């Protein structure tokens, strides 16, 4: 999908709503689960100027790190942003300011970045390349619910990201566990209260 076309679609929808007397926020709320959670995170990183709130669940224990390198080693997308010059320092600052919530079920076994213990590479090489997997395992870890999930949170918090994380015990790969939290965030960030535009 061309992200610029998506932004144009959003703007077109906003204009059509306005013509019908329906006011909308200047920024969007983007929410995704599993593969679409990665889209929500990456879209927010690439276009933070249009996002008010980003929500993602079942994120495979990791997010794209909004940094270019670690200890002098360039981070390649989607592990980091070392090869994405379009993500400027200003965009990184905007991204860190966007309200975000990411969550995992602690019984989730759906790991698209799982490692093949025999050859020490990714099982699903059509999802992540060998070089990307090498960096992912090196800096975040191969264990989805262990080091990878923990280190991702540590990186985002250390960078000062406006983020919350949720870990739900006894839950697998499904969004239900976080529904109350997600609904609360939506209510807090929708552009109206009690049927009145604000």
Language model region names:
Residues 1-21:
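Alpha/beta-hydrolase active-site loop
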Residues 22-23, 35, 47, 92-97:
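Extracellular/periplasmic catalytic domains that process cell-envelope and extracellular macromolecules
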Residues 28, 100, 163-164:
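Hydrophobic anchor at the start of a short beta-strand
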Residues 31-36, 40:
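Gly/Ala-rich beta-loop-alpha elbow adjacent to hydrolase catalytic centers
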Residues 42-53:
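Conserved hydrolase catalytic core segment
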Residues 53, 60-159:
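The feature captures the conserved acid-bearing segment of alpha/beta-hydrolase catalytic domains
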Residues 133-134, 143-198:
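C-terminal catalytic histidine-bearing segment of alpha/beta-hydrolase fold enzymes
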């Amino acid at each position: 999908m061309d992200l610029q076309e998506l932004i144009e679609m959003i703007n077109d929808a906003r204009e059509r709503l306005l013509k019908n007397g329906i006011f909308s926020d200047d920024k969007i709320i983007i929410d995704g689960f599993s593969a679409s959670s990665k889209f929500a995170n990456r879209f927010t990183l690439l276009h933070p100027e249009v996002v008010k709130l980003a929500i993602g669940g079942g994120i495979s224990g990791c997010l794209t790190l909004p940094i270019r390198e670690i200890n002098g080693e360039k981070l390649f997308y989607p592990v980091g942003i070392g090869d994405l010059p379009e993500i400027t320092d200003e965009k990184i600052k905007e991204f860190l300011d966007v309200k975000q919530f990411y969550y995992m079920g602690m019984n989730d076994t759906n790991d698209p970045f799982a490692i093949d213990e025999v050859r020490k590479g990714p099982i699903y090489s059509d999802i992540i390349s060998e070089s990307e997997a090498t960096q992912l395992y090196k800096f975040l870890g191969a264990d989805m619910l262990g080091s990878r999930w923990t280190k991702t949170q540590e990186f985002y918090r250390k960078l000062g990201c406006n983020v919350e994380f949720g870990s739900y015990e006894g839950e697998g790969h499904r969004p239900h566990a976080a529904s109350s939290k997600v609904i609360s965030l939506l209510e807090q960030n929708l552009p109206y209260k009690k049927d009145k535009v604000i």
